[in-house]
Curated annotation (Swiss-Prot):
Keywords: Lipoyl
Upper classification of the organism: Bacteria, Pseudomonadati, Pseudomonadota, Gammaproteobacteria, Alteromonadales
Gene encoding the protein: gcvH
Segments forming domain Lipoyl-binding: 24-106
Name of the featured protein: Glycine cleavage system H protein
GO cellular component, one term: cytosol
Keyword Metal-binding set for record: no
Membership in a protein family: Belongs to the GcvH family.
Self-association state and partner proteins as the record states: The glycine cleavage system is composed of four proteins: P, T, L and H.
Length: 129
């Protein structure tokens, strides 16, 4: 059973966000998601400057088992991507909530954050799977 950090917000599609000091949000996939996918072999990220829309696919995580679309938890402009994943996609497996982050978004509508789940709500999603 993986631990779900209480300081993050979650999408039911297994992405997490963390607010940063500059007002942007870091996006990644949860420990649970990486466990389901297995060993990562490739991560396709959006481009810096791209606009992402909440609920729409914007990245792909490929593992030895499957390729899975990654959905934007909130809308906004991509301001950074985790270039380390290009050479080391396994960071998603070893540190899903840390060094395995995918990209950062400057939100266009911060109220979308309110629609995301807290740790308890996300645990309920996992329990219902």
């Amino acid at each position: 059973m993986s631990t779900i950090p209480a300081d993050l917000k979650y999408a039911s599609s297994h992405e997490w966000i963390r607010k940063e000091s500059d007002g942007s949000y870091t996006v990644g996939i949860t420990e649970h998601a990486q466990e389901l996918l297995g060993d990562m072999v490739f991560v396709e990220l959006p481009e810096v400057g791209d606009t992402v829309t909440a609920g729409e696919d914007c990245a792909v995580a490929e593992s030895v088992k499957a390729a899975s679309d990654i959905y934007a938890p909130i809308s906004g402009e991509v301001i950074a991507v985790n270039e380390s994943l290009e050479d080391s996609p396994e960071l998603v497996n070893s540190d899903a909530f840390g060094d395995g982050w995918f990209f950062r978004v400057m939100p266009s509508d911060e109220s979308e954050v309110d629609a995301l789940l807290d740790a308890d709500g996300y645990q309920e999603v996992i329990d219902e799977e």
